[in-house]
Regions:
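N-terminus-centric sequence/structural signature that marks the extreme N-terminus
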Residues: 1-146
Length: 146
């Protein structure tokens, strides 16, 4: 099981105090280590900080998180824990609609589903999950769980 943590505020610029907030994110990772000892990562932007520890199950090499994709100059970032039972179907549906994948991970399927379908994409997910998506364009942090 992976671990996810973070913080968000549109009233604060976390990058102005990068060392402080980077340290906080790293402390979060340390606390989550037992939930995902295989890999870990952080993401820090003006409005948002995310931390992730990973227990590698699928796409062991390319499923690193936080996973970042760019659209029209804006970043979309996901930290994810879970298992989708309909990964293959969603992936094929997105490929047919022109989406391109860099990995075979559930994480990327979830993020690209969000980018393609918008916030209602979660209704398409069949599985067990908890995740956060940072939407830089709309300056939002979206939290989801099954």
């Amino acid at each position: 099981m992976c671990g996810i943590a973070g913080f968000f505020s549109t009233q604060k610029d976390y990058c102005k105090e990068f060392p402080r907030y980077d340290h906080i994110l790293n402390q979060m990772k340390v606390r989550l280590y037992s939930r995902g000892p295989d890999e870990n990562g952080t993401f820090l932007a003006k409005e948002c900080g995310l931390a992730h520890t990973r227990l590698s199950i699928r796409d062991l090499k390319a499923g690193s998180q936080p996973m970042i994709r760019q659209r029209n100059g804006y970043r979309y970032v996901i930290i994810y824990n879970g298992e989708l039972y309909n990964t293959k179907e969603l992936r094929n549906e997105l490929i047919q609609r022109g989406e391109q994948f860099e990995t075979t991970s559930d994480t990327e399927v979830v993020l690209l589903s969000f980018l393609y379908y918008g916030t209602d994409f979660v209704k398409k997910l069949d599985g067990i999950f908890a995740f956060a998506i940072f939407d830089e364009f709309h300056e939002k942090l979206l939290l989801y769980r099954d």
